[in-house]
UniProtKB/Swiss-Prot annotation:
EC number: 3.-.-.-
Record keyword Membrane present: no
Protein family (similarity comment): Belongs to the uve1/UvsE family.
Record-given protein name: UV DNA damage endonuclease
Lineage: Bacteria, Bacillati, Bacillota, Bacilli, Bacillales
InterPro entries the UniProt entry points to: UvdE, UvdE_bac, Xyl_isomerase-like_sf
GO biological process, one term: pyrimidine dimer repair
SUPFAM superfamilies, alphabetized: Xylose isomerase-like
GO MF annotation, one: endonuclease activity
Role this protein plays: Component in a DNA repair pathway. Removal of UV LIGHT damaged nucleotides. Recognizes pyrimidine dimers and cleave a phosphodiester bond immediately 5' to the lesion.
Alphabetical keyword list: DNA damage, DNA excision, DNA repair, Endonuclease, Hydrolase, Nuclease
Length: 317
């Protein structure tokens, strides 16, 4: 069984390399037209340059997975901000895509919790479609839209989970097919359990990104030993491996919050289940220390008898 690793957005080992420098709408509105354009251009340019720097870091360290920042382009989906970020930065988008393709990196996006399809308010669904379209357009500008995924949560329950799930199935049909085809769903830590998310994924033929920490925080009745093979099977129509999110609790009191590093004892039960299934898969580390947490976990795992480190961020078990 081969397990590959990656991390989210910021490479903490790199100095001053945030790919998500921001600009608020309030500050944008205070500026004159040319100042607005200049500020948006400069912040986006810096985020793109930092993304390229991070990708080179990943390539040098043989890290095959990476979650791109959703905030590369500030105010990209704000209705009052007109900024042709695709055309203006076309050469840089292509450069990023070429790096990703040349080195066979697996990249993804994860829009924020407000991008959901369970609301009974039409404008919420409209905003979700706008946000998903932004992420897809960026992937398309990179030339990797057909091989990369956009991950979201199911959404809220609004006091009636069954009705909310019905709305999800109804609202998701409004998302253009070419974008829906590149989306994944993740179980969450409070509302939609692993089994509930799996049922939605199976019905909509959407790959399931399983989050182990969320699963433990929001358990369902079905044992994970039975669910995980079905979760992995939701990826069978794609050309990529199943992906899993790993983090561990900050403390008993703050159980849902992510710790700086991974507690190996916390994830061992999950790893033993995957060993029984013996299916290759990818792990996205969601700890606060990101790449450093990932590398520390790989070192700890590679010291276990029977686990072999193939390269910097890939293990064989």
């Amino acid at each position: 069984m081969i397990i590959r690793f990656g991390y989210v957005s910021h490479a903490t080992a790199l100095w001053d390399c945030s790919p998500a420098k921001t600009m608020t709408f309030t500050s944008w509105k205070k500026l004159k037209k040319q100042e607005r354009e200049d500020k948006l251009y400069n912040v986006t340019l810096q985020n793109l340059e930092h993304t390229i720097r991070i990708l080179h870091y990943n390539i040098a360290h043989e890290i095959p997975l990476y979650r791109l920042s959703s905030s590369i382009v500030p105010l990209a989906t704000h209705p009052e901000v007109e900024f042709d970020y695709i055309q203006i930065f076309a050469p840089l988008w292509r450069k990023i895509g070429a790096l990703i393709q040349e080195h066979n990196l697996r990249v993804s996006f994860h829009p924020n919790q407000f991008t959901l399809f369970t609301s009974d308010k039409p404008h919420i669904t409209t905003n979700a479609i706008t946000d998903m379209t932004y992420h897809y357009n960026v992937l398309n500008a990179m030339g990797i839209a057909d091989s990369s995924y956009i991950n979201i949560h199911v959404g809220g329950a609004y006091g009636n989970k069954e009705k909310a799930i019905e709305r999800f199935h109804e609202n998701i049909q409004k998302l253009p097919y070419h974008i829906k085809r590149q989306m994944t769903l993740e179980n969450d830590d409070k509302t939609y359990t692993t089994s509930e998310t799996l049922a939605i994924c199976q019905k909509e033929k959407i790959p399931f990104v399983f989050d182990y920490h969320h699963h433990i925080a929001n358990l369902c009745n079905e044992p994970l030993e039975e669910l995980l093979p079905m979760i992995f099977k939701t990826w069978s129509h794609t050309n990529v491996l199943p992906k899993v999110h790993i983090s561990s609790p900050r403390s008993e009191k703050e159980f849902r919050a992510h710790a700086d590093y991974i507690d190996l004892e916390f994830i061992k039960p999950f790893l033993h289940i995957t060993k029984k299934i013996n299916h290759n898969f990818d792990i996205m580390i969601e700890s606060k220390q990101k790449d450093l947490a990932m590398l520390q976990l790989i070192c700890e795992l590679s010291s276990i008898r029977g686990i072999k480190r193939i390269n910097s961020a890939t293990l064989q078990w």
